Amino acid sequence: MSSKDKNVKVRTDRVVISVITLLILVALIVLIVSKVSNNSNNPSQSVNQTVQDTTTSTSDTTPPTDTTLEETTTTSQSGHNVEVIDGCTYIDGILIINKSYSASPEYQGYNGGLEDTKPTPPIGLFPEVIESFNTMQQDAKNQGLDIYIASGYRSYYYQLNVYNRYCETDPPEVVDTYSARAGYSEHQSGYAFDLNSIDDSFADTDEGKWVAENCHKYGFIVRFPKGKEDITGYQYESWHLRYVGVDVATYIYENNLCLEEYLGVDSVYKD
């Protein structure tokens, strides 16, 4: 092959390579333009993908709502802290059981609340209750007085029998003024008990008078005081004490309150 022919071939090859390169570039440009055009004409695909990604992210990081939680916390209108634990309501840390606030049948006071209303020491009452009562009992004894727990913890089903037995002689609307329905009795709380004779005469005894004037010093209140029947929902019971701690008991005593007034709640059956 002559030198002239070689030069012609080289030029031809260069032209072919240039043309091929140009065609490749044009094809790439067309492909890019086509893709951009398709995305701009169908923006919903991008939006939907974004929503899907966001939803997935949220479901992975946000815990599901659990309707079986045993404890919930909220704030009442009166500004008190309210906790519901295992079906029982605590206001500012104080367990409230009355006609508006019940305890579940499973709630058993302290240590399972073994069924015995006259044990020594009282089974089912919390240790701080027993300790405070023992101190009060000894101080009363030093004054020549005899106080003792006649009825302590009662289970849901024990109270059910008590209430039903009363209903055999009195109509329910009358029984409701002096006995609690099952689940609404403070005796189930493990913080309440009855003293001595468990009747109206206790208020006029030396023991009854001493208890009324001094029980707050040991953390107890007369749970259903005289003159508060419309608020507590029960008749005056001088023998029924409830442990709430010395500070709260003293405040209630000095301000002539009942527990409902102190906690800002009512005591009314819904039916």
What are the roles of these predicted feature ranges?
Residues 2-152, 156-271:
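Extracytoplasmic cell-surface/polysaccharide-interacting catalytic and binding patches
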